[in-house]
Amino acid sequence: GTEVVVDQQKTISALLGASPGASTAAPITLNVLKQMFPQQFNSPEWQSRIHAIVPSYGQKLNGNVALTQQVWDDTAATLQLTKPPVIQMPAAAPTATAKPAETPREASPQHDMAL
């Protein structure tokens, strides 16, 4: 992973570790901004700008099918890619009903055959 390191005066930061690829560059950049400029980052003005750039910022995509689909569609449109497939979530599996306990049969002797 990549670690963001910031000096105490918040005048310089560095990334340590593997070089970030495209899939991690945006989250790491946001993390650098958050650590370097914590007061500004949490201000309504910055939050508004961040959400304008990354509308799903601060929201979990896992388990949120509608938001995930929206992010996929928006990304594909912005990058002029083929629209991604619609996420089809299977219907909730029916809960298993408990079966009555089986009556134990007489145990038959088991023979262990060593070869």
Swiss-Prot record:
Any one Gene Ontology BP term: tricarboxylic acid cycle
List where Low complexity composition bias occurs: 90-101
State the UniProt keywords alphabetically: FAD, Flavoprotein, Oxidoreductase, Tricarboxylic acid cycle
| E.C. number | 1.1.5.4
Q: Name one GO molecular function term.
A: L-malate dehydrogenase (quinone) activity
Basic and acidic residues bias: start-end ranges: 102-115
Q: Which reaction does it catalyse?
A: (S)-malate + a quinone = a quinol + oxaloacetate
Q: In which pathway does it act?
A: Carbohydrate metabolism; tricarboxylic acid cycle; oxaloacetate from (S)-malate (quinone route): step 1/1
Cofactor(s), by name: FAD
Q: Is the keyword Zinc-finger assigned to this protein? A: no
Q: Which residues form the signal peptide?
A: none
Region Disordered, as annotated, extends over 88-115
Family of the protein in this entry: Belongs to the MQO family.
Spell out the protein name for this chain: Probable malate:quinone oxidoreductase
